[in-house]
């Protein structure tokens, strides 16, 4: 029997700018990639093998696009499966708007959407943390946390049981200094 050729890749795997990627494996066997595009929306691509990618659509349409920062751009999505929902955390900001930017979330039943926006979780001026962007979700011991930050330090805060809002009474905790941006945490056994 002939051997199946091994697929290889060459960067870029998608031939246009998609910074701040977040990937999740869906129950349908596809890997789903969410990224920043032109700050107007969050494109979604999928792949069976992490080599060949196809465009699926965007997380939001013009009518469903978040608007808590009216002229704000969307970037740095973070996708997770919490319970039976796909939860998409996103940043919304205008350049120079370090006190009005913030982080919101949206949910969907399937990784390709459609996503229902739940609006802002917080803005920088509401929690006294300048430049609150670049979200990253993690769960540990049944507790849910959101990390974020961009050149003003990396912060963390505990979330509600469903992960869609801040836990009542939770306050931001600074976990890293001012020279860091874009949190990623990898668990190691």
What are these regions (language model features)?
Residues 1-189:
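Carbohydrate-active catalytic/glycan-binding domains of CAZyme proteins
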């Amino acid at each position: 029997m002939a051997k199946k050729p091994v697929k290889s890749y060459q960067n870029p795997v998608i031939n246009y700018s998609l910074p701040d990627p977040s990937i999740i494996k869906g129950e349908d066997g596809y890997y789903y990639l969410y990224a920043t595009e032109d700050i107007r929306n969050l494109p979604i691509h999928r792949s069976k093998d992490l080599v060949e990618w196809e465009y699926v659509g965007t997380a939001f349409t013009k009518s469903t696009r978040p608007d808590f920062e009216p002229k704000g751009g969307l970037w740095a999505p973070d996708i997770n499966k919490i319970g039976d929902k796909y939860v998409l955390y996103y940043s919304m900001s205008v350049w120079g708007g370090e006190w009005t930017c913030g982080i919101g979330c949206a949910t969907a039943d399937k990784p390709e959407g459609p996503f229902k926006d739940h609006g802002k979780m917080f803005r920088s001026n509401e929690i006294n943390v300048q430049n609150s962007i670049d979200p990253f979700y993690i769960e540990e011991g049944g507790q849910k946390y959101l990390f974020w930050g961009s050149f003003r330090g990396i912060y963390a805060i505990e979330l509600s049981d469903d992960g869609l809002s801040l836990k009542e009474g939770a306050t931001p905790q600074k976990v890293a200094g001012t020279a860091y941006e874009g949190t990623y945490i990898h668990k190691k056994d």
